[in-house]
């Protein structure tokens, strides 16, 4: 085992955002008088400049005290040989965030509150307005010390004299964070970090990389040399089962729910049955002309809540970031290797690997959800604001969104095959 403070590879793009998003852009174009109709191009350029409009720029800044991400980490491992020459390995690892990235928008100021359910304090969230007359967004990069992760694993392994190696392992883990820093762009790291208060001090939630359960079974066979020592064969199969991927429950937004300038980054408030009756649903019409009345939308939302295990057990509160899990994922990979042993210890090896062999057997097997970031069962249709700045009360109206369940990734779920050749000496 051991303990220490660790820093991984630093994404310097987080720092370079401040150099590439300064609020000033220089662009040029070349217009030749030889182009038909451009004999008087000086006046044409002047007309464009005069008629043009200026959009407020966006800038990225880095707090002076910013430090590269660091974690305190401790691990302990034990290995024991059991009867039958079976190896048992136990390991635990714990990491505590010391410095991680956190993004905030300095152009925003709180001007009131928005109530997901009118009059229900538990559903209140800060309502923002752009306080800068010069900038659209001012994304500040600073640190947070919130966050931790741990993992406990156990593995059994047995090696047989005839060349078979068998291993099985199970890992239980938990990872929580404020911002996973999944984007290279400062603005994206801020706007896609789903939360109740999108510009607040930082809300802890499950990390996008959290995998509570993982099961792995591995079988490898390496044959002895045959055909007078010219050939040998290796075959491997690996099964991996994981408890799906994490995703957030959010609100789709036709109108900006909390005035932060971005639509779709607000976590869903899950109403109680009584609160649901107070929500302002309105009728909607889909692309085929089918009408959903307000009462039907309300009932459909209730049915969706009852069908989602997390929402059903967390009514009367905002959903946590990455609170939900996709279905359990099963994957089998195959490996076949054929070696030709030449003189002078030179070996030619031909390999065949089938990734996601499960899907090769049946197109409904081996599916994965890939990056299922969020689902939104309701749409914020319109925000009605009352009161003066500093004491604004905002209330939304909703429509129901029928496409509110994660779907498997078509590309990531497909099997693929790889052929290889190498010379070893």
Locate each region found by the language model.
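Membrane-embedded beta-strand positions of outer-membrane beta-barrel proteins
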Residues: 1, 78, 90, 156, ...
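Solvent-exposed loop/turn elements at secondary-structure boundaries
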Residues: 2-142, 316, 327, 397
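Residue-level signature of outer-membrane beta-barrel architecture
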Residues: 5, 80, 154, 158, ...
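Hydrophobic, lipid-facing positions within transmembrane beta-strands of outer-membrane proteins
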Residues: 62, 72-76, 150-154, 213-219, ...
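Short loop/turn motifs that connect adjacent beta-strands in outer-membrane beta-barrel proteins
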Residues: 84-85, 163, 224-233, 341-350
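Gram-negative outer-membrane beta-barrel transporters
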Residues: 91-229, 234-244
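Outer-membrane beta-barrel "beta-signal"
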Residues: 165, 412-425
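Extracytoplasmic gating/loop element in the C-terminal half of outer-membrane beta-barrel translocons
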Residues: 234-344, 371-406
């Amino acid at each position: 085992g051991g303990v220490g403070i660790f820093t991984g590879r630093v994404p310097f793009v987080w720092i370079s955002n401040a150099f590439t998003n300064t609020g000033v852009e220089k662009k040029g174009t070349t217009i030749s008088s030889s182009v038909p109709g451009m004999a008087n191009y000086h006046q044409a350029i002047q007309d464009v400049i005069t008629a043009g409009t200026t959009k407020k720029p966006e800038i990225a800044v880095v707090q002076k005290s910013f430090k590269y991400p660091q974690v305190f980490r401790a691990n302990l491992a034990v290995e024991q040989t059991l009867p039958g020459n079976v190896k048992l390995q136990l390991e635990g690892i714990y990491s505590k965030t010391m410095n991680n990235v956190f993004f905030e928008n300095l152009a925003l100021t709180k001007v009131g509150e928005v109530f997901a359910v009118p009059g229900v304090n538990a559903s209140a969230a800060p309502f923002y307005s752009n306080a800068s007359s010069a900038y659209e967004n001012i994304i500040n990069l600073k640190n947070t010390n919130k966050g931790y992760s741990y993992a406990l694993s156990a593995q059994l392994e047995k090696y047989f004299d005839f060349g078979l190696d068998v291993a099985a392992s199970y890992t239980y883990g938990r990872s929580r964070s404020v911002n996973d820093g999944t984007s290279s762009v400062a603005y994206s790291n801020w706007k896609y970090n789903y939360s109740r208060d999108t510009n607040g001090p930082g809300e802890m939630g499950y990390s996008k990389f959290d995998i509570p359960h993982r099961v792995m079974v591995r079988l490898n066979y390496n044959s002895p040399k045959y055909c007078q020592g010219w050939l040998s064969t290796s075959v491997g199969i690996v099964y991996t089962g994981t408890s799906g991927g994490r995703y957030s429950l959010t609100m789709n937004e036709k109108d900006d729910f909390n005035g932060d300038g971005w639509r779709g980054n607000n976590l869903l408030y899950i109403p109680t049955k009584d609160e649901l009756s107070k929500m302002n649903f309105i009728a909607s019409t889909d692309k085929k002309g089918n009408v959903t009345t307000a009462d039907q939308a309300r009932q459909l939302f209730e049915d969706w809540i009852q069908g989602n295990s997390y929402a059903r057990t967390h009514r009367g509160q905002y959903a946590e970031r990455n609170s939900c899990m996709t279905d359990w994922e099963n994957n089998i990979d195959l490996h076949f290797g054929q070696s030709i042993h030449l003189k002078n210890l030179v070996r030619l090896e031909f390999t065949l690997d089938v990734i996601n062999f499960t899907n090769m057997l049946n197109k409904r097997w081996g599916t994965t959800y890939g990056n299922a970031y969020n689902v939104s069962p309701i749409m914020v249709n319109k925000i009605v604001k009352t009161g003066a700045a500093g004491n604004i009360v905002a209330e939304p109206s909703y429509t129901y969104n029928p496409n509110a369940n994660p779907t498997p990734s078509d590309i990531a779920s497909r099997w693929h095959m790889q052929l290889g050749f190498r010379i070893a000496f």
